[in-house]
Swiss-Prot record:
Belongs to the AB hydrolase superfamily. MhpC family. The gene is mhpC. Keywords: Aromatic hydrocarbons catabolism, Hydrolase. It comes from Klebsiella pneumoniae subsp. pneumoniae (strain ATCC 700721 / MGH 78578). This is 2-hydroxy-6-oxononadienedioate/2-hydroxy-6-oxononatrienedioate hydrolase. Pathway: Aromatic compound metabolism; 3-phenylpropanoate degradation.
Amino acid sequence: MSYQPQTEAATSRFLNVDEGGRTLRIHINDCGDGKETVVMLHGSGPGATGWANFSRNIDPLVEAGYRVLLLDCPGWGKSDAIVNSGSRSDLNARILKSVVDQLGIDKVHLLGNLMGGHSAVAFTLSWPERVAKLVLMGGGTGGMSLFTPMPTEGIKLLNALYREPTIENLKKMMSIFVFDTRDLTEALFEARLNNMLSRRDHLDNFVKSLEANPKQFPDFGPRLGEISAPTLIVWGRNDRFVPMDAGLRLLAGIAGSELHIYRDCGHWAQWEHADSFNQLVLNFLARA
């Protein structure tokens, strides 16, 4: 029987998760039924969702025999909003722990982009026995760059978009989000803008969280040596959101890790170089 592509609607489900005495309704997409599970964690951009971030990567993994979970972190997608005054990455890690516990999944491969990479590291540091392999793209430490003024131009545009969610500001941010802008269609802009404007509580949640704690993503650099899970680091040479030397920090800090750099690639390697990225990840996961 030929493979049937996954759809957002058919894989959509909700779980109730306790966070500090409050019940949060968390949205996931649960794709495939393989024995090994890959959890994909999205970035922090306005309007981001698990499905939107990884739409070009889901089917190759499911077709290869993996179960794929896409988590909408609190404050994004269809999940509830929450104003966070602590570490956003540790919050996401706790939510993910509750999700996989409810689903009866013991061990996972974690794949995360920007905030998702940082949250994957937070999860690994808290529950190392639950992580099989790590794939980190454009994020993971939260530390300062040695070569690029911080915050970067990309992060400045991202924060401006949260405060003024207009199509003009969205296009400004996306124009440096990827290296080759020819794939940035009007349909993509409209979908992302609709995601943002349909959940203004999520926009407010992020702004208020930053006001409560500007350092939502702490520097995990000093603790990277605690990570023993096999780790693949993927970066775009032209990333204008998180400088490439952050990837070198991960490489230096995580024993046995490997770094793959894409030339002519911005912050969205899994989307900009999807075919190559998918094969890279499949080869990495298949290794003994």
